[in-house]
Amino acid sequence: KSYAGDFTLARSLTAAIETKMRLAERMIEAWQGAPARRPAAFGRLIPLAEEYLKHLKAFERAFRNMWHRHNKPFGLESTQIRLAGQRERTEELIRRMRAFADKEPGSGFPELDDLLEIREGVDMTFPSYRRIAYSNVNS
């Protein structure tokens, strides 16, 4: 039994968070660009979103392995539900990015307009830990 920590778990979590932060930052930059160029800019971000999904799945596997080494089987399902939700949100993001890049009617990310507003004197134009950690923009 190792007490030094699970470096596979730590690396996979770090890779997932770092990639998610880069994706959020680049999505904001793409949305702040010229409206006519937004679809192509989002299309170029699809590989980064897919990279995040890959890291998220690696973290899921590493977390499951760590859990079974150190805990009883019950209890894991609550974390599995959360991670499955995060995975599905990411897959939906990729679908929406593809639709926007293909200029499908009704596609886009109008919620980013709200995100980029200055609220209560706080500049919301950068990714914050709270939005990233809780995977929504309303926190």
Language-model-derived ranges and their functions:
Residues K1-S139:
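Catalytic domains of carbohydrate-active enzymes that cleave complex glycans
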